[in-house]
Amino acid sequence: MTQKVRHTDRAFAYANGIEIAYDTLGDPAADPLLLINGLGGQLITWHEGFCAELAARGYRIIRFDNRDVGLSTKFDQAGVPDLSPLTADQERGKEVEAPYTLRDMADDAIGLLDALNVSSAHVVGTSMGGRIAHLMAICYPHRIRTLTSVMASMGEPGFPPPKPEVLSVLMEPAPTNRQAYIESSLVSARALGGRGFPLDEAFIREAAGKAFDRGSNPDGITRQLAALMAAASNKSELKSLRVPSLIIHGSDDPLIPVECAIDIANTIPGAQLLIIEGMGHSLMDIPGVWSQVIDAVARHTI
């Protein structure tokens, strides 16, 4: 049963030169646990039921909007990158230009911890958020108590590419109409899901509607994607990481193959690996997998 936990109202912090929207759940005196979203995810993407269960395990949960989404600072003055030439540059191994970098986003997260007077925290990042969490651990190891990397890669070449039908869905601009946005979210969830966990379409529609109403920003998502495309592999840095690390991945991930998770676990000294059978590239959309992830994080952060 989900226990009732303390919850902050919507708040903003000045971090790394921008405004970051955040909230917290749980005992303010408990061990801090920072949640970092993937591409386009807002803080509410971390479902409150999931966060409440984590908080009930004895954590102060901190969730936030990455730059350019939700209620955090937008970078509209940077324009909207054209993804076609960026994709061509990436395929040719050329340097990809982006309005900002994943390192900037890692610095945002560290700045948020500074603003909250949190000297160190457990960090959990999903997908792009996993890459951001890697950079936090590489650049600020003394600030990271433990690292949990979920559905992420190191940006290392040579792995099977995403399935074309999945990539085409993700490269589509997010609709600016509410109903179209909800339907697009459902299409994405179907493309990213795994065989082991059936989709709850009503659950996904409700979450998508809330996300649209709160702060959908298609241009910001495109800029985030450009930052992700521009990011170099961090494998060499992770080889010498001394932060306790847990790698979680789905066996059926159609976007980032499970081999990427195995590679991360083999790269970070002492890293633990949890492969969830039947899970795709989705976590918050499938409440049936939450307990496995929460149990694993709780064991890892003891």
Name these PLM-found stretches.
Residues 14, 18-92:
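Conserved HGGG/HGGXW glycine-rich cap/lid loop of the alpha/beta-hydrolase fold
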Residues 130-141, 147:
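Short glycine-enriched nucleophile-adjacent loop
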Residues 138, 146-176:
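Flexible "cap/lid" loop of the alpha/beta hydrolase fold
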Residues 241, 247-249, 253:
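Short beta-strand/loop motif that positions the catalytic acidic residue
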Residues 91-99, 103-121:
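Conserved acidic catalytic loop of the alpha/beta-hydrolase fold
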Residues 271-302:
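Catalytic active-site module of serine/aspartate enzymes centered on a nucleophile-bearing elbow/loop
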Residues 254-260:
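Conserved alpha/beta-hydrolase "acid-adjacent" motif
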Residues 162-236, 263:
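Alpha/beta-hydrolase
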